[in-house]
């Protein structure tokens, strides 16, 4: 590949990133429905037509944000290897996930992500997509716990992963509806310890992963 083509690719990546960051900033400031593509392009310092080179609609920005979240999960998965059991890994994942949503995704963006998936006709239902990296990560941890004899085997790992992610979406949705009326990390960890982990366990009694 020539230097010129490398430079064009770098410029394209820079422009796409600028449009994405501008859109996310504006969505947080003004709300998704109040932002136009022209607003996004102006904020990014590029022509309106450039937007359509990288995105078809504003909704594509939402999909891109989900991909960014999944990229975080990929990085996080590597850090979980330092824990010795699947129970500890899921507990650590849950805590990191809650912190990431609170501190990096943020309340306003979370509202936009959920409302877009619920309200937009024809929108890609990425929140419930079992092909997402998140589902595969949780399924892998459940399978590990089943091999260790810690997690129940009367329900498939795939089904348990589905129920797990559904449960945590409920926590995120409750936080968004309440408009940050409770501590997402604190209550999210309580939900994990009191509800989710006992439901995964091979025995009937609740166990805590805290130390």
Name every feature range the model reports, one short phrase each.
Residues 1-30, 34-46, 60:
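Basic, helix-initiating cap at the start of DNA-binding domains
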Residues 20, 91, 95, 135, ...:
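An amphipathic alpha-helix signature
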Residues 44-55:
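Short hydrophobic/aromatic patch on the recognition helix
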Residues 55, 61-69:
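Alpha-helical DNA-contacting segments of helix-turn-helix folds
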Residues 64, 78-104, 157, 161-164, ...:
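Hydrophobic alpha-helical connector segments
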Residues 98-139, 150, 159:
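Short secondary-structure transition hinges
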Residues 110, 124, 128, 146-193, ...:
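Hydrophobic/aromatic-rich alpha-helical bundle segments in the mid-to-C-terminal region
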